[in-house]
Amino acid sequence: MELSYYEILEVEKHSNQETIKKSYRKLALKYHPDRNAGDKEAEEKFKLINEAYGVLGDEKKRALYDRYGKKGLNQAGTSQSDFSDFFEDLGSFFEDAFGFGARGSKRQKSSIAPDYLQMIELSFKEAVFGCKKTIKAQYQSVCESCDGTGAKDKALENCKQCNGQGQVFMRQGFMSFAQTCGACQGKGKIIKTPCQACKGKTYILKDEEIDAIIPEGIDDQNRMVLKNKGNEYEKGKRGDLYLEARVKEDEHFKREGCDLFIKAPVFFTTIALGHTIKVPSLRGDELELKIPRNAKDRQAFAFRNEGVKHPESSYRGSLIVELQVIYPKSLNKEQQGLLEKLHASFGYEGEPHKSVLETCVSKIKDWFK
């Protein structure tokens, strides 16, 4: 029988993110291929652990998995392969604590990080329908004056702290642990005299304008990647630019994933009699909502496939209309009289509280006899 992602990570279904991440790190460390050379079983276990954390470590993917299982993830077009940020963090965790690196982690000769993150503001309309947007970006480029060394005349010295190794070693009992040298940040070299052009930073800042294609259905805090638009970490080589969406709220529609919510205020007589009202759809059409008699306040009605498209699949959510019953703030004499006649016409049915409350009062009186 196939194990669930929770069983693979050895956590309960109600576990929080901190517990899940802690268990993941523990298991990833235990089954890491660098610690289990030639062990195919450990390698497969390591892959399963990464797959499980890729889903449970992301709240949106976790919610899909909890509701629909793996099948739901596949149908929603959820990718389980892009966890580069976490693996880079995990790689440094392995390297600093145990003296070996995670496979696939980026080993950088340059002090310039290849990738960088930039926020992009989108209107509700731009996010829902997608758009082409020109963004102003500023990236780090290798300083030509010092060839990215950060030193005047490219003159670097061996770090005295680590003797040019980039690592220092610590002993605990019978074990020796390697740590990145703090004096040179693992480079093994230090700057004697800073470059005047970049002030020893190894890079200068350059501005550019980029035409970005925003996919239909992108949501707040979603990220998209622009390949080769990141920092120039080596001469002629650039990393990736990650854009994180900041989507403004709409006055009428509220969004949760691919579902849209809208409140429809209806008068109390409409609820009593039943009625058909027009509801605006996302694409400008009018949808007919048949309100049944005696519908309840906050009762919701769903229009399937009238929501937002998933940015990575053909799936489209629902438009959910929530009724908001409105009562008159005041009545004139004629309205008061009409309501009183209507109320009286129901007879005993118009006073349902009596059967409940009078029985309760009678019971309480019996208690004190």
From Swiss-Prot:
InterPro entries given in the database record: DnaJ, DnaJ_C, DnaJ_domain, HSP40/DnaJ_pept-bd, HSP_DnaJ_Cys-rich_dom, HSP_DnaJ_Cys-rich_dom_sf, J_dom_sf
Where are zinc fingers of the kind CR-type found along the chain? Answer: 130-207
Q: Name one GO biological process term.
A: protein refolding
Q: Name one GO cellular component term.
A: cytoplasm
Which keywords does UniProt give here? Chaperone, Cytoplasm, DNA replication, Metal-binding, Repeat, Stress response, Zinc, Zinc-finger
| Native source species | Helicobacter pylori (strain J99 / ATCC 700824)
Give residue ranges for domain J: 4-69
Residue positions binding Zn(2+) 1: C143, C146, C195, C198
Q: Which Gene3D superfamilies match?
A: DnaJ domain, Heat shock protein DnaJ, cysteine-rich domain, Urease metallochaperone UreE, N-terminal domain
Share what the entry says about its subunit structure, partners included: Homodimer.
Its subcellular locations are: Cytoplasm
Q: Note the segments forming the CXXCXGXG motif repeats.
A: 143-150, 159-166, 181-188, 195-202
* Pfam families reported in the protein's UniProt record: DnaJ (PF00226), DnaJ_C (PF01556), DnaJ_CXXCXGXG (PF00684)
Instruction: Enumerate the SUPFAM superfamilies for this protein.
Output: Chaperone J-domain (SSF46565), DnaJ/Hsp40 cysteine-rich domain (SSF57938), HSP40/DnaJ peptide-binding domain (SSF49493)
Known cofactor(s): Zn(2+)
An example Gene Ontology molecular-function term: unfolded protein binding
Under what name is this protein listed? Chaperone protein DnaJ
Q: Does the keyword Transferase apply?
A: no
Q: Which gene encodes it?
A: dnaJ
Chain residues that bind Zn(2+) 2: C159, C162, C181, C184
Protein origin, superkingdom: Bacteria
* CC cofactor note: Binds 2 Zn(2+) ions per monomer.
UniProt lists the family membership as follows: Belongs to the DnaJ family.
Task: State the function annotated in the UniProt record.
Answer: Participates actively in the response to hyperosmotic and heat shock by preventing the aggregation of stress-denatured proteins and by disaggregating proteins, also in an autonomous, DnaK-independent fashion. Unfolded proteins bind initially to DnaJ; upon interaction with the DnaJ-bound protein, DnaK hydrolyzes its bound ATP, resulting in the formation of a stable complex. GrpE releases ADP from DnaK; ATP binding to DnaK triggers the release of the substrate protein, thus completing the reaction cycle.
